[in-house]
Curated annotation (Swiss-Prot):
GO terms for cellular component: chloroplast thylakoid membrane; proton-transporting ATP synthase complex; proton-transporting two-sector ATPase complex, proton-transporting domain. F(1)F(0) ATP synthase produces ATP from ADP in the presence of a proton or sodium gradient. F-type ATPases consist of two structural domains, F(1) containing the extramembraneous catalytic core and F(0) containing the membrane proton channel, linked together by a central stalk and a peripheral stalk. During catalysis, ATP synthesis in the catalytic domain of F(1) is coupled via a rotary mechanism of the central stalk subunits to proton translocation. Key component of the F(0) channel; it plays a direct role in translocation across the membrane. A homomeric c-ring of between 10-14 subunits forms the central stalk rotor element with the F(1) delta and epsilon subunits. This is ATP synthase subunit c, chloroplastic. Keywords: ATP synthesis, CF(0), Chloroplast, Hydrogen ion transport, Ion transport, Lipid-binding, Membrane, Plastid, Thylakoid, Transmembrane, Transmembrane helix, Transport. The lineage of its organism: Eukaryota, Sar, Rhizaria, Cercozoa, Chlorarachniophyceae. Disulfide bonds: none annotated. Its main location: plastid. It holds the Pfam family ATP-synt_C. It is found in: Plastid, Chloroplast thylakoid membrane.
Length: 81
């Protein structure tokens, strides 16, 4: 395999997982902050808020998992070699 392609794949894999984690990380922090604020305002709605928060966390985390899959494909099943 060409060393340039191998090195580029490693850099691309690092960027894929790094950039895929930034957005969901910021989104999860913001969502958790607003959920805590909502629970503080209406403690009786805690169950509904928590359920919606956990569901949204799952959707946000799936974006990071997609980035991980792309990184693993670039590392182990390199389509460019």
């Amino acid at each position: 395999m060409n060393p340039l392609i191998s090195a580029s794949s490693v850099v691309a894999a690092g960027l894929a997982i790094g950039l895929a984690a930034i957005g969901p990380g910021i989104g999860q922090g913001t969502a958790a902050g607003y959920a805590v604020e909502g629970i503080a305002r209406q403690p009786e709605a805690e169950g509904k808020i928590r359920g919606a928060l956990l569901l949204s966390f799952a959707f946000m985390e799936s974006l990071t998992i997609y980035g991980l899959v792309v990184a693993l494909v670039l590392l182990f099943a390199n389509p460019f070699s």
